[in-house]
């Protein structure tokens, strides 16, 4: 309450001074504490405050180690692998912070943050690049039917439950963005994106896309993939989470 009262006075003074244009609304978006594993405020081992540059570098280093364990280093040249590790590490930190209700206190947990499972940045980055890979294969199999370009104009026919669940969730993107703008609570967008990615995983596992027949069904499912890719890309971009070209 003390902080809220302080900022109300600051905004009132700024308005009287003419620094705030008429009709402009200012609000203080209060945030909670970030705790270390010991339950105290996040600090270095020596007890000093954590520097953001050091924290992000450690995130990149940890992401690189996890990607090596997943054999990703063998699939990319060193330059691209370094770019991917940087995107995953920095994206993980950003997403972990924004996915928590901003007034809540949370524990800074590296293992949870850089995990490729659950509501995390790496999971959503992987889901997005996975859809991109579907379109790369679609373009490489032109003889099999419609490719990526056609998916942008194809109609969508709902033929299975997972398709319906995903399509309905995609329809809610606009409302979620409006809610985030009105409340200054980006964790709502994070929760939505996680739901989209989870529903897409179920859809992709249960509904053949590139092998779907007839060609009209293949085009329909590619169109649903395209809309999912658009939603995830927009959401992660708004959150400032980088998306690697491949993972």
Predicted segments — roles?
Residues 1-247:
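Non-catalytic interaction-recognition regions
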């Amino acid at each position: 309450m003390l902080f809220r009262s302080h900022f109300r006075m600051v905004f009132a003074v700024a308005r009287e001074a003419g620094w705030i244009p008429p009709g402009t609304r200012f609000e203080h978006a209060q945030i909670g504490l970030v705790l270390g594993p010991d339950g105290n405020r996040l600090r270095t081992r020596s007890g000093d405050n954590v520097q953001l540059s050091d924290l992000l570098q450690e995130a990149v280093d940890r992401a690189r180690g996890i990607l090596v364990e997943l054999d990703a280093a063998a699939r990319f040249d060193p330059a691209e692998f370094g770019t991917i590790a940087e995107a995953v590490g920095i994206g993980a930190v950003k997403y972990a912070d924004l996915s928590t209700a901003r007034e809540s206190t949370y524990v800074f947990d590296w293992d949870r943050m850089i995990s490729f499972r659950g509501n995390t940045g790496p999971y959503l980055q992987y889901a997005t690049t996975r859809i991109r890979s579907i379109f790369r294969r679609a373009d490489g199999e032109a003889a099999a039917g419609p490719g990526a370009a056609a998916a942008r104009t194809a109609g969508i026919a709902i033929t299975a439950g997972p398709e319906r669940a995903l399509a309905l969730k995609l329809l809610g993107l606009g409302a979620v963005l409006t809610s985030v703008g009105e409340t200054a609570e980006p964790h709502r967008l994070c929760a939505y994106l996680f739901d989209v990615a989870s529903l897409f995983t179920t859809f992709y596992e249960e509904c053949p896309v590139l092998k779907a027949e007839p060609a009209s069904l293949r085009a329909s499912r590619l169109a649903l993939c395209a809309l999912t890719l658009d939603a995830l890309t927009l959401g992660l971009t708004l959150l400032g989470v980088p998306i690697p070209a491949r993972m």
